[in-house]
């Protein structure tokens, strides 16, 4: 039996998440996995990512670093309680040595509001012994937060002009 390539392993994991396959974490991750969603709450010691803002974390409390399989399982369960992936586009996985990256988009419905959002993503992977050891997920958090926004408008000042994003 041939072993999976890194690209195949990553594609299989992402497919399992869409199916809400609860056994995926045990099959695809190293026991000491570092699973980062959009950044950490504190500065990255390696300087690769800035910390996420307190406002962003308040809006989307599942962001941050989840260490170990149990923490990843809790994150995924929390995510699945709050949103339903309703569609996804083509995915590209690039792999070299023990590192890989995946790029694509998905559409989800926020279960609390019924709103949908389409979100592009990029994921950086590090693999060890055929398992995912580091997973760094980046997405458009503004679109995600907007789908969960239950009321109120956003007032923005860009390019010297004020803009209002109404509640939908």
Task: Please state what every model-predicted region is.
Residues 1-168:
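C-terminal and inter-domain tail/linker signature
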């Amino acid at each position: 039996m041939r072993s999976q390539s890194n690209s195949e392993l990553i594609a299989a994991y992402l497919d399992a998440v869409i199916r809400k396959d609860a056994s995926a974490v045990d099959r695809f991750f190293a026991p000491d996995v570092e699973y980062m969603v959009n950044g950490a709450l504190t500065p990255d010691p390696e300087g690769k990512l800035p910390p996420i803002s307190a406002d962003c974390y308040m809006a989307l409390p599942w962001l941050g670093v989840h260490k170990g399989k149990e923490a990843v399982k809790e994150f995924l369960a929390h995510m699945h309680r709050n949103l339903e992936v309703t569609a996804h586009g083509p995915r590209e996985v690039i792999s070299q040595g023990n590192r890989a990256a995946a790029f694509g988009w998905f559409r989800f419905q926020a279960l609390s509001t019924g709103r949908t959002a389409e979100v592009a993503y990029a994921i950086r992977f590090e693999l060890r012994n055929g398992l995912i050891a580091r997973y760094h997920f980046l997405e458009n958090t503004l679109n995600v937060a907007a789908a969960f926004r239950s009321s109120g408008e956003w007032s923005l000042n860009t390019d010297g002009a004020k803009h209002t994003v109404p509640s939908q």
